[in-house]
């Protein structure tokens, strides 16, 4: 079963990853985590997202397009990245989510990939 793990972090942590001085050390736990998933053969893909302030949100209401700079969500934790994993069960996906560096400082959302009906 495929699952998407979305890594949600406080803005301060996202800024730390982009800081030239703090970034390399901030990325070390992520390198270890991704390496562990790759070694286990469960990782199918994923990426770090650009900082939330680079986002543009588009909505359409009544045929009118509305564009907003920045992320739509007004929360303390914002999506910082994602990975697609292929594991046997939700329980196994939850175990990988628990190991995520985001889980200790923010959250990790686990969502199954929906397949179109046959």
What is each of the regions a protein language model found here?
Residues 1-118:
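Conserved, structured core segments of small domains
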